[in-house]
UniProtKB/Swiss-Prot annotation:
Transmembrane segments: none annotated. Belongs to the glycosyl hydrolase 3 family. This is Probable beta-glucosidase A. GO terms for cellular component: extracellular region. GO terms for biological process: carbohydrate catabolic process; cellulose catabolic process. Glycans are attached at residues 62, 212, 253, 316, 323, 355, 443, 524, 543, 565, 669, 713, 846. Coiled coil: none annotated. Residues 1-19 form the signal peptide. It comes from Aspergillus oryzae (strain ATCC 42149 / RIB 40). Its EC number is 3.2.1.21.
Amino acid sequence: MKLGWIEVAALAAASVVSAKDDLAYSPPFYPSPWADGQGEWAEVYKRAVDIVSQMTLTEKVNLTTGTGWQLERCVGQTGSVPRLNIPSLCLQDSPLGIRFSDYNSAFPAGVNVAATWDKTLAYLRGQAMGEEFSDKGIDVQLGPAAGPLGAHPDGGRNWEGFSPDPALTGVLFAETIKGIQDAGVIATAKHYIMNEQEHFRQQPEAAGYGFNVSDSLSSNVDDKTMHELYLWPFADAVRAGVGAVMCSYNQINNSYGCENSETLNKLLKAELGFQGFVMSDWTAHHSGVGAALAGLDMSMPGDVTFDSGTSFWGANLTVGVLNGTIPQWRVDDMAVRIMAAYYKVGRDTKYTPPNFSSWTRDEYGFAHNHVSEGAYERVNEFVDVQRDHADLIRRIGAQSTVLLKNKGALPLSRKEKLVALLGEDAGSNSWGANGCDDRGCDNGTLAMAWGSGTANFPYLVTPEQAIQNEVLQGRGNVFAVTDSWALDKIAAAARQASVSLVFVNSDSGEGYLSVDGNEGDRNNITLWKNGDNVVKTAANNCNNTVVIIHSVGPVLIDEWYDHPNVTGILWAGLPGQESGNSIADVLYGRVNPGAKSPFTWGKTRESYGSPLVKDANNGNGAPQSDFTQGVFIDYRHFDKFNETPIYEFGYGLSYTTFELSDLHVQPLNASRYTPTSGMTEAAKNFGEIGDASEYVYPEGLERIHEFIYPWINSTDLKASSDDSNYGWEDSKYIPEGATDGSAQPRLPASGGAGGNPGLYEDLFRVSVKVKNTGNVAGDEVPQLYVSLGGPNEPKVVLRKFERIHLAPSQEAVWTTTLTRRDLANWDVSAQDWTVTPYPKTIYVGNSSRKLPLQASLPKAQ
C-alpha cells in the first residue's frame, strides 16, 4: 500500500532495530492488541465504542494528535470533536503539581512519598493533586513516574519517581494513581520504560551538548530483569486502572520507546492487559505508521519538532488509513482507548475548560500563543485551586524526613540559648522561589529539583524562616550564615551556638537544563555548594551539630557522618512549599520521625555499581547502556557484593523504640496456577470510512499557522502526502502480521489487569506483633522481605510493608499476605511467572539489614 514520507521515517525501528549484529535487539510483536474492556473497564469500554462508532475518520484522528507546541493553553492538547460534544483534552505536567500555572500547590516529590512508606499519604497526595488539576481545567495529569526506577543513584530524574525498589515503588505508584483518578483526572504512568538517565536520552539534546550521535541512547536489558524490576511497578499501575501511559525518549534494546512493539504491544497491552492509551513523551514520536502499528495511541504535542507545523500523524494518519497502510481497527482502537480512559475517571461529568495559560502570566493574550493568532481573550483567570492542601504538604514533608543519626541532640526543646543556622540551603533564593525557569538553579534552600517535573511555588517557607520563628517563640537567639563559602563566619557562629543546624543539598533534574555543569544527571553524588566543608567547619567548632540534607537521592557523607560532634543527621529530600515548617515540626518534636530511607547510603559512588553512560560509546551510533547488573541495584547490589553501606535501605530512627515479635505464617487454600490460553476476539471496526473527499479541509476554515489538523489537502493522496517515495510496497516497511486483525493467541502471563489473575492470588497470611517500647508515640514500618532461594537471586527482596502508629507501650498485630507474584520468578523459556522449587524464606524487620524474624515457607504452586 502507500504512505506519506513522514510515515516512512524510522519505520525500521519498529521491527528490525539493529544495524550491527552485536547490538541488543528488540524482537517484533504484532499486531497491536485492541482493547476489550476487561474487568472494571467493561462499562466505559462500551460507552467508548458507542461514541467512537459515531465519529468520522478525521474526528478519530483529532483525538490521537496534539495540536502543536504552544498553540493552545496546555503543554499538550488534542483536537476536539464538537459535533459529539467532546472537548479538546488538556494534558499538563507534572508529577508533583501543576507546571506553568499559578495559585496551585507545590507538593513534595515522589522520592519523599517513598520515604514515608505510607500508602494513605500517597493516595491523599494523588487525590489532592487531582483536585487541583481538575479545578484548573486539566484532563490528564502527566504523572506519576516510576521511570526512572533509579538504577543509577546519580540519575537526574530519580526524584520524580519513588524508589529503586520495585515493590515499594509499585505500591505507592498505584496509590497515587488511584488518588488522582478518584479526583476525576486521568493519571499518566511514566516514563515507560528504562528511561534511567538523562545523558543521550534525546539525540538533538545530546547534539546541543556537543555529542555527534545519530540516535538516542539504547537501554539494553534482558527479559528477566525487565519483568522482575522495571516492568513490576507498571503492572501495579495497570492493576490500579491507570488511564494513560507515557512512552519514553530512549530506545530499549535499540528500538525507540514510542515505537517498540515488544514493550508496547507485547508487555504493556498483551501481557499486562492495559486498556487505556499510550501517549508519546514530547517529541518522542519518531515515525507515523511504525509507531501506530507498534502501539502508540496519542502523539504529543503533535508536531514533529516544537512549532514545526508538521506531524507524523494528524493529516498523515488520515492518509495512512485511507490508503490502507494502517487498518481502520488500529485508529479505532486508539480512539476507543482514549475515550474509555476519559469516561473511566468521570471526566465527562467534571470537565471544565482550561482557565490558565501555560505560556504567559498575563491576564489577556492570543488564543494561539506561539503564532499570536486567534482571538485576543482572557487566557488566565487566576483560579486559586490550593484548598487546604498546605496542611497535607506539611504533613508529608515531616513524615518523609528520615532520622539517620541522633546522639541525644533531638528533639530540640526551644530552650536552646543560641541556635546557629548554617549553609545556603537554610535560606531563600535571592531571585525568588520561582526565579529560575523550571527551577533550573540551586540557589537557596532546595525544596524541588529541576525540569518539566516541577510546579511554581505559591510560596516557599525556608528553614531559616520557620526555625527562627521557633527560636523567637522560645525567647532564644538565632544567628544565620547562609553563605556556604564564608567558612570563617560559619566557624564564628558555630563556636557560640548551643546547637548548630547545618543545611546542605544536592540537586539534579531533566537533561534540557544544565545546572553548574550537571546536564540533568549528577556529575557525582557529593554535596553541592561546599556542603562538606560547611559541615566539617561547624562540627569542628560546635559539639552539637545537626545536619539536615535536602537532596534528590543519596549523597556521600563518609567524610563527616561519624564525626563525634555531628550529633544528628536528617534527610529531608524535596519537601515542597512547606519545607521549613516540615523540618521544624520534626526538629522540635511535634512530629516523631518515622520515615525510612527509600534508597541505600553507600560510602562511595562505586559501591553502587550501575555507572551512567556519559560518553558516546558506539561511535556516531546510538550510545549503548547495558544493564548487565540485572536485578542487582541499590540494596540488592550491596548485598550481592558484600558492600557495607553507611545507612541501608529501609533504615530510619525515631524518638521512640519498637520491638517486633511473634512471626506467624499461615498457608492459604490457593488454587493451582494456570497459564492463560485461548484466543482473543478479532479486531472490530467502529463506524464506516468514506472516500477521501469527505476528509478534505472544510471550505472556509481559517487555518491557524503551524496548527496540526486532521484534514488532507486533496483527494489525491499522493499529493496530500507530499512524498516522492509514495507507493512503496508493504513488504518494504510493514512488519509481518502488523495489520492482521484476526483473533490472536493469548499470552500465558496475560488474562487480567496487571497480568495473569493467578499472580495476585494470596498464598500465605503473615502476622507480626509490633510494640512501641518507648515513652512517646511514634510510627514504625515493619518490612517483609523474601529470599527466593535461587543461586542467582538477590539475598532478599522487599515484598510487603506498613506504616503503623503506636502510643507508648501500645502493641498491634500487623497482618499481610503474600501473593504468588511475591514468590515468583520470570521464566524466560516459558514466558511466564513460576514459583521455583528453591526454598523460600521470609524475613521481617525494620530495614533491609535488620531482619530479626524469619520463617521458612512451605512449597507453593
